[in-house]
Amino acid sequence: MHKIAAAPPPSATPGGGLETPLAAPKYGTLIPNRIFVGGISGDTTEADLTRVFSAYGTVKSTKIIVDRAGVSKGYGFVTFETEQEAQRLQADGECVVLRDRKLNIAPAIKKQPNPLQSIVATNGAVYYTTTPPAPISNIPMDQFAAAVYPPAAGVPAIYPPSAMQYQPFYQYYSVPMNVPTIWPQNYQENHSPLLHSPTSNPHSPHSQSHPQSPCWSIEDLRDTLPRV
């Protein structure tokens, strides 16, 4: 089998009809019997890949990767019947052109998932979980606080929700107080001079003074007793 002559680099091709193909991933798990094909044009179909690569062996399946809208991402995979056919294409297919595009042939590698992607938000902000200090009072504190670190300027950051509002706690204290003595009303009327004001209305039935009972001394009582 004759090798296909190597084409000049895309930048040196007259007219600029060819474009730089996409590169295959560098790290991951090697998939046997399968090759990576980059640099596929948007109008290329899986049937076109089957027709081109059938010259290198028995093509078992072809797959062009598309996005959610169904638009081709520019690369795909071709699976052969045996591993020898896939390796022979990688050795002989130095320049495979399809629809005026040079295809990039490389081993098919399954990329390893990145554990850091699980903490990256859609806007590029990275979330970290921090532990608050130990509480110093009886008021409960938040268990976790979210800190947002934007990667660059101009990227909108997501702020955590407002902290929970706690009602203040008041403790009851019993303070002893000196309560003044309250005397009966009759005692105040008879002995308190403040109740008999000289400016009171004399015609008022409540302001008239009550007749006082006469006061007798011991000498007066002696005069009234019969002498023996």
Curated annotation (Swiss-Prot):
It comes from the Eukaryota. It comes from Drosophila melanogaster (Fruit fly). SUPFAM superfamilies: RNA-binding domain, RBD (SSF54928). Gene3D superfamilies: 3.30.70.330. The lineage of its organism: Eukaryota, Metazoa, Ecdysozoa, Arthropoda, Hexapoda. Keywords: Activator, Cytoplasm, Developmental protein, Differentiation, Nucleus, RNA-binding, Spermatogenesis, Translation regulation. This is Protein boule. GO terms for cellular component: cytoplasm; nucleus; perikaryon. One of its GO terms (biological process) is positive regulation of translational initiation. Residues 219-228 have a biased composition (Basic and acidic residues). Residues 151-178 form the DAZ domain. Testis specific. Residues 193-214 have a biased composition (Low complexity). It is found in: Nucleus; Cytoplasm. Residues 33-110 form the RRM domain. RNA-binding protein that plays a central role in spermatogenesis. Required for meiotic entry and germline differentiation, at the transition between G2 and M phases of meiosis I. Acts by regulating translation of specific mRNAs, possibly by binding to their 3'-UTR. Essential for translation of twine (twe) mRNA. Required for the expression of various genes such as CG6784, CG17210, CG15841 scpr-B, scpr-C, and rho-6. PROSITE patterns: DAZ, RRM. Belongs to the RRM DAZ family.
